[in-house]
Each structure stands twice: as structure tokens, then as C-alpha cells.
């Protein structure tokens, strides 16, 4: 039915836009109407309306409660103790969205979107020539059901459970979520009692878990696992050069978030504080960072402790800081130079010792050809005698 209802709206929009292109006037008409909805108390609701016309029509929102003698009243941005917000735009056509927060049962009733482009639509004494067009949506606010959530834990397992009483409609499944992550989905279970098992220690799985029942409207409960901060160091050991900036980081993934962070140097009971030219400490939620602006090899080297505290207790971690002298970076280069010098010296000594041996070898090589020549002469004489 929604698709069929959109067809006349689309046709009307084309007719009005065609009239606008031709430069003529056109009475106001809806191209989107608000839809009826069901909500639970403490939830919020949003209704949307769009209209076309020439000139561009004005849109207003009106409300009439379910009480027998209640009359219709216009809604304004900021009404009902600032629970009502209305956003409207007037460009090629009119759009308006009304948002109502923290619903109560008194908010049930008929919400009406009105549109008109008659010049006299808001005149106090003159009646408009064209009546306001109207589109209505019913909002039913149902009392929120009671959902009891709890957990139990052992050495290696955590069991979450929820139980709903007086669901608004039949239950058609459920799911478990942690933040934006879906942990488990069951679309066939119609039970009011549901559970979810987590393998591991309770300290490693803190947070706010949601149990969501597939009813109309959707009913949500939560199970909160709260532990003391499980503080860990980003690196257990950090290195820095003298004169540079040293950065030590700690974090806690636990829930509730850390309320207070403190840094201590080994052997000191007074926490470090940010001071110009020495320390800069940042604390952002579950993360803290200690910056030592100019590392000193004598004063800054050692162990540092980061301590986090929340409503459940406190936790800490230790980071070891090692500071190197600026000359430390030259040692590898000096080592290479020393190796090259030793190698050159060895080659030089070897060459010096090898030269006398080469001279002796040259003398022996000069006498050898003489013996060879004498032998050749003897061979020639022997061949001559044989020839004779």
C-alpha cells in the first residue's frame, strides 16, 4: 500500500513542477506524508513530511491527544520542555521533520502535517482562499516492559541473562549486542528468558551488553559488567636519545572508563604533573600519555608507573625508560671505521712481508733458462752424430 500511495504523490509532484517550469501558480500538495508508529515510553519518534506548490508552501505540525475533550494544538520547535525539535527546509519544495524525545504515554495521539501556500494563510482577520491541506499519522506510546539483566562468572566463563515481563507483543526472536557488534541472533526463540555465554575471564569482557527482543516495538534491556581498570602499557620498554622527547603510553580497555590517571616515577610517591619544559601529561578517556620533553640520561632513566582509577577500583602498569647518550648513535659508525682500519693495516703488513719473497723467486727464475739452453745444445749434438 505504501508503494501505491507514492504513485499519486509522484504524479502530483510532476504536475506541480511542470506548472513551476511554465511560470504558473499551483496549490500545495503532499509528496511525502508522515507514517503511523508504535513506540515505548522513554523512546523517541521522528515524523517526516514534504509538500510542493507555487509559491513554495509553508508546513506546520499540529497534535491532538487521545483524551476525549482534548483539542488540536500547534507544535513549535522547543515545545514540551524542549522535547520537540522541528527542522524545515524551503528550496525547490518544502520539507519538515519533527522529532520528539523521551516519550510518555501522554504523547500518544494524532500528529498532523499541514501545508499551505495561500498568501492569507496566517492572516488574523482575513480567511484564506485555499484551505490548509492535511496529512495525519497516529503515534501509540506503550508502557516500557521491565527487562531484568544480570550475569554470573566463574574462572573461565561469563553467563549473561535477560528476562522480560509483559512484552508489548509476541516475541519473535532476540539478539545480543556489544556496541555495534552483533554477538548472537536467534529469530525463532519466543522465550522471555534468554542467555548468552562468553568464554574467558570476566575482567577481559567488561562493557554494556544489550539484549534485544523482536517485538513491536522492539524492547531492549542491558547487562552491565563493571570491573576495575585493567591497565596495560603500550610498550613495556621505551628507548630515547638524550635531549629528545620521550613518550610513554598506557591504556585501559575496561568498563567503566577511567576517571583519573596518574604517573609516578620509581621510588617516588608524589605523582608527576604537567610543567613547562619538563613533563606534558595527556588524559583522554581510557588512554594516558606522558611526554618527557628533554630526556636527561641521569635524571629520567628508570621505571615509570601509570595508575588508572574508576568507580570499581584502580590498576597500574610499569614502563621502563632507557636513555641513550647522543654519542651512542656514533658507536656503530666508529666500529665500522675501526674494522676498516684493522683490515687495511693487515693488508699493508702482508704486502710488506710478501715483497722480499718475490725478489728471491725472481733470482731463481733467471738461472733456470741457462740450464735449459745447455741441455738443448747437448740434444742437438746427439742428433748430429746419429745423422752421421
Curated annotation (Swiss-Prot):
Region annotation (Disordered) ranges: 358-388
Chain ranges of the Ig-like V-type domain: 229-323
Residues in the Cytoplasmic compartment per record: 345-388
Transmembrane intervals: 324-344
GO molecular function, one term: signaling receptor activity
Glycan-modified residues: 163, 222, 280, 286, 307
Sequence ranges on the Extracellular membrane side: 27-323
Disulfide bonds: 49-113, 162-211, 250-306
UniProt domain Ig-like C2-type: residue ranges: 143-218
Gene3D superfamilies associated with the record: Immunoglobulins
Pfam families, sorted: Ig_3
Protein name: Basigin
Organism of provenance: Gallus gallus (Chicken)
Lineage of producing organism: Eukaryota, Metazoa, Chordata, Craniata, Vertebrata
Gene: BSG
